[in-house]
Every structure is written in C-alpha cells, then in structure tokens.
Design a protein with these regions (language model features):
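C-terminal amphipathic helix plus adjacent low-complexity
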Residues: 276, 280-388
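Catalytic binding pocket for nucleotide-activated donors in carbohydrate/polymer assembly enzymes
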Residues: 87, 106, 110-113, 118, ...
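Active-site and donor-binding regions of nucleotide-sugar-utilizing enzymes
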Residues: 4-133
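A donor-sugar binding/catalytic signature common to diverse glycosyltransferases
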Residues: 57-65, 215-258
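Nucleotide-activated donor-binding/catalytic signature segment of Leloir-type glycosyltransferases, i.e.
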Residues: 193-214
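Hydrophobic/aromatic beta-strand patches that form the interior of the parallel beta-sheet core
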Residues: 47, 62-63, 89-91, 117, ...
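Structural alpha-helical scaffold elements that stabilize or flank donor/cofactor-binding regions
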Residues: 39-40, 83, 170, 220-221, ...
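Conserved catalytic-core segment of nucleotide-activated headgroup transferases in glycan assembly
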Residues: 2, 7-10, 15-22, 122-198, ...
C-alpha cells in the first residue's frame, strides 16, 4: 500500500512555485508533502518535472512537464531523450502535447506504467485568484502600473547582448507601462545572473521601467499586462493561454550554444518581428488589440485544457490510481505498439545510459567520476590529434 506522502522534486524557483500550488491541494486531501531539490530523494510518491529524473528512488512516480514548450526542437518525440516508461503516471498540459504523444505512443518509452492523462497546465490554476478584482487592483498598485495606459511585458528565455536595453528603448517612445520580468536563474548560471544585474543597474533609475523580482510568478506579471515580448520563452505560450498577444523578436540571439543561435519561434500563436521593427509592431498590436487578443483567446480555447482547475484533476487521478478506485478520468489510448527503429533504439539506449552515468553514478561515486573524467580526457586527446 502506497502511503499518502508526496515528495515534489524541483530544480529552480519556478518549478517550486508550481509544486507549492499542487502541494496545497494535496494537503487538503490528507497527503503529507515535501518539497526538495534533492533529485536522489527516497520517497513514497515522487513527483517529477525535470528533463532528467531518478524515479527508481520512489515507490510510485508522477511525471509532468516543467515547460509548456519543453524540448521544442525535438518535437514530437521528446520521449526519445526523456522516456516516461520508468514512471507510473504522466500528465500532459494541452491538446498540442496530446498530439505529440499520440505520434510517439506506439513506442514503449513514451508510455508510463499506468497511463498518460490530459490534465492541463497547473500554473494556470492561479488564474482564479485574479477573478477577484480587489486582489488584482492591489497588485497593480503595489508594482506601480498606470491603469490608464496599456502595459507591455518583457520576459525573455535568456538575457544577453543587451536585449533588455533594446526592448526598453523600443518602448520608451510609446505611452505604455514598461515591465521587465527576468527568469529566476540559479547560481550555476553565472553569466545570466551577471547580465541581468547589469541590465537592472542600467534601468533602475528610469521611472518608466518597472523591474519585477525575478522570483515573481510569471502569470502574475502576464495578468496585469496587455502584450508580452520575448524570443523563444514558454512565457509566450502562457501569455496566449491567458488571451494576451505574444511577440517573438526573431533576431534576438539565444546563447545556449556557441556561436549563439536565432530563437526557435516558429509557433503558430506568436507575432514575429525583428528588433529594428519592435516599436512599430507594438503600435500595430495596440491599434488592433481586439483582433490580436481574440486570436490569442481562440488559440487558447482550442488547445488548452481545464484552465483554472487542472490541479484538482491531477489529484483526483492520483487518488484513484494509488487507492485502486474507479477513475473518472480516462487515460489516453496509445497506438498499437511498434518496435523502435534500430537507429532510434540505439540512440535512446545510449542517451539513457550516458545520462544515468553522468547525472547519477558520477555524482554519487568518486571512483566513477574519476573514470569518467579520465575517459573524457582521452577522448579529447584523440580528437585533438585527428584535428591536428
């Protein structure tokens, strides 16, 4: 019998915020809850959302996404690299993700032991809090928004090359509230923290610019904004989910590779522009706001499920599965099982083994870490001789 104890394993502040919402509902149902950043935590029910997890340390495991556009460059088959067959149940946030999963459900690695469910996006459950106009007004007054003006929010995936400054300079000619919400990076991302600090220092004395604490819930910022500007961040998807137009600046660079690349922004739901035309793009959206907002809302209505009450559905499913009771929600039906093509299977096995060794055994064993480092150096020497 599985005890009613859930351990939520998070990597960053954003994931922790979402887990706090789920834990609140779980506590109401009699669950003991723990939030931890220890990815090796041994637990009764482990709740995971990162790319690489270790559910072997839990008696029962739940998997969901941490990013609504997670692994976008590898769609539809994110499960090739991030298999779900090692978990008990999986939760999907939208019809887009159901479509991704359907295309891959014929492969064993996309199927949790007890099924995949369309539940919705748990972060969106905060929307109900903003149905109270008094709470919304209080937040608007707290951060200093002028309600007589439209509000444009900057929420990038990465801060680099002075993007925040380019955004601010593009907005200053307009009669708008200017809000900045950077991502809450952890200490291991020193370059990002340095870039954000430099931008904060640059704009801190500009009365037109409201710089929010990076730990602010992004949905709070979106709710009091009219337009969101980014490059490839999932914040654009969340903005559209809430019926707010989102703009992707397609020639802002993304520094996660060397040399930096252009953003992966070929989403149907965003307005694309170049940084040189950002001012005019915002003017056009504001001049035709009803049209753009209606398009965003239509996309949201078509693609997102259970907005505002996803978490109770997740907990209903978990209750039913661990207690062996009738489940009023039906798991998605996978396609007839097929063998994984040999090239995909080889890649999948190699990637799974590499991640297990690098992120698990290497961290828990000094001997394995030394062997890994030694092998890596040998490989580097071989490659340098080949190139030389």
């Amino acid at each position: 019998m599985i005890k009613k104890e859930i351990t939520f394993i998070y990597f960053d502040e954003v994931q922790k915020q979402v887990y706090e919402l789920i834990a609140e509902e779980a506590n109401k149902r009699g669950y003991k809850t723990i939030l931890t950043d220890n990815k090796f935590s041994r637990c009764e029910i482990g709740w995971y959302c990162e790319h690489i997890n270790f559910p072997q340390f839990s008696k029962f495991s739940v998997i969901m996404l941490h990013d609504i556009t997670q692994q976008y460059g590898n769609w539809p088959d994110i499960w090739l690299r991030e298999p779900w067959n090692k978990y008990d149940i999986g939760f999907l946030p939208s019809n887009i993700w159901v479509n991704n999963w359907n295309q891959c459900s014929k492969y064993y690695y996309a199927n949790p032991r007890k099924g995949v469910y369309l539940t919705g996006w748990p972060k969106a459950d905060r929307l109900s809090a903003f149905m109270d106009e008094k709470k919304k007004d209080t937040y608007i007054k707290t951060i200093g928004i002028d309600r007589s003006k439209p509000t444009v929010l900057y929420a990038p995936a990465w801060e680099n090359d002075g993007k925040q400054d380019e955004f601010v300079n593009a907005m200053l000619p307009l009669d708008v509230n200017i809000i900045v919400k950077q991502a809450p990076w952890t200490d291991i991302y020193e370059d990002q923290l340095k870039n954000i600090a430099e931008m904060h220092e640059l704009h801190k004395n500009n009365s037109r610019v409201i710089q929010l604490d990076p730990k602010t819930n992004i949905l709070d910022a979106i709710m009091v904004s009219d337009i969101l500007v980014s490059e490839e961040s999932s914040t654009m998807c969340e903005s559209v989910m809430m019926g707010k137009p989102a703009v992707s600046v397609c020639n802002w660079l993304i520094p996660d590779v060397t040399p930096s690349r252009y953003p992966a922004d070929n989403y149907e739901y965003v307005v694309k522009t170049k940084k040189e035309n950002l001012t005019n793009c915002i003017i056009d959206i504001l001049d035709n706001y009803e049209k753009y907002a209606a398009e965003a809302q239509a996309y949201s209505d078509e693609h997102f499920a259970n907005i505002g009450h996803c978490i109770p559905i997740m907990m209903d499913i978990l209750d039913a599965v661990i207690e062996g009771k009738e489940n009023k929600y039906t798991a998605l039906k996978p396609k007839e099982r097929e063998r994984v093509p040999m090239n995909k299977l080889f890649f999948h096995k190699k990637e799974t083994l590499k991640r297990e060794v690098y992120f698990h055994y290497r961290e828990q064993s000094k001997t394995i870490d030394m062997l890994w480092t030694f092998a890596k150096r040998i490989k580097q020497r071989i490659n340098s001789r080949k190139n030389g």
